[in-house]
Amino acid sequence: MTSVLIVEDEESLADPLAFLLRKEGFEATVVTDGPAALAEFDRAGADIVLLDLMLPGMSGTDVCKQLRARSSVPVIMVTARDSEIDKVVGLELGADDYVTKPYSARELIARIRAVLRRGGDDDSEMSDGVLESGPVRMDVERHVVSVNGDTITLPLKEFDLLEYLMRNSGRVLTRGQLIDRVWGADYVGDTKTLDVHVKRLRSKIEADPANPVHLVTVRGLGYKLEG
């Protein structure tokens, strides 16, 4: 059974959502603050985390940082704040999606399913083998990436994005192609999400992220991974 960890201090939102998730066949656990979320994750794990940005005490961004240090578990940020900077910060920390309150519980469950589908894609074209491009080596089956022999940690979306780029090394991929492949054709949003993930990837695979030579921008088109 797919487990969902709900980190939300508003019981009026968390409890009905947990009830609906259970009706839909998920295992749902609710915690109301950051330390409890980390303790529960360490105790039982989770297949996906719904994380409120505005938590009492330890913020959602700090919780996301701690989760990313532990795991590549998918994270959907949930918040009442609709500021673009909030979204960018959440995505830079490794969140896989971002939902603004008030939201439809059914819509949120659809997003959960979409994120889990993308994370569990078993298409053989995109799921097996060892890929190499320049200093980057990816073992797709083991979900391990190394740069110049040093292992790096990538959240799920960064891993998926890098895998698609590596499978198309030397080829220009448009922003639309990348978003459709990594976030899905039902993704609603702009290209800033992609650009944030590219920036994060560059910080991990480039010797000088400000002057990339491997993951390069093709002006007016998209991105290309050079071998």
Curated annotation (Swiss-Prot):
Keywords: DNA-binding, Phosphoprotein, Stress response, Transcription, Transcription regulation, Two-component regulatory system, Virulence. The modification 4-aspartylphosphate is found at D52. Phosphorylated by SenX3. Phosphorylated and inhibited by PknB. PROSITE patterns: OMPR_PHOB (PS51755), RESPONSE_REGULATORY (PS50110). Residues 128-227 bind DNA. CDD domains: REC_OmpR_RegX3-like, trans_reg_C. One of its GO terms (cellular component) is cytosol. Disruption phenotype: The senX3-regX3 deletion mutant shows a growth defect after infection of macrophages and is attenuated in both immunodeficient and immunocompetent mice. Deletion of the gene leads to differential regulation of a set of genes involved in, among others, cell wall and cell processes, intermediary metabolism, respiration, virulence and transcriptional regulation. Deletion mutant is attenuated in terms of its ability to withstand hypoxia. Phosphorylation by SenX3 stimulates binding to the target promoters. Activation of the SenX3-RegX3 two-component system is inhibited by PhoY1 and PhoY2 when phosphate is readily available. Overexpression of the kinase domain of PknB (PknB-KDMtb) inhibits the transcriptional activity of RegX3 by phosphorylating Thr-100, Thr-191 and Thr-217. Phosphorylation at Thr-191 and Thr-217 abolishes the DNA-binding ability of RegX3 and phosphorylation at Thr-100 likely prevents RegX3 from being activated through conformational changes induced by SenX3-mediated phosphorylation. Changing T100E: Significantly reduces phosphorylation by PknB. Inactivates transcriptional activity. It holds the Pfam family Trans_reg_C. GO terms for biological process: phosphorelay signal transduction system; regulation of DNA-templated transcription; regulation of phosphate metabolic process. Residues 3-116 form the Response regulatory domain. Induction: Part of the senX3-regX3 operon. The two genes are separated by a rather long intercistronic region composed of a class of duplicated sequences named mycobacterial interspersed repetitive units (MIRUs). Significantly up-regulated after 28 days of hypoxia. One of its GO terms (molecular function) is DNA binding. Homodimer in active state. In solution, exists as both a monomer and a dimer in a concentration-dependent equilibrium. Member of the two-component regulatory system SenX3/RegX3 involved in stress response. The system is involved in phosphate starvation response. Plays a role in modulating expression of aerobic response and in the regulation of response to hypoxia. Involved in virulence. Regulates dozens of genes, directly or indirectly. Is directly involved in the regulation of the expression of gltA, cydAB and ald. Binds to the upstream regions of the hypoxia-associated genes Rv3334, whiB7, Rv0195, Rv0196 and Rv1960c. This is Sensory transduction protein RegX3.
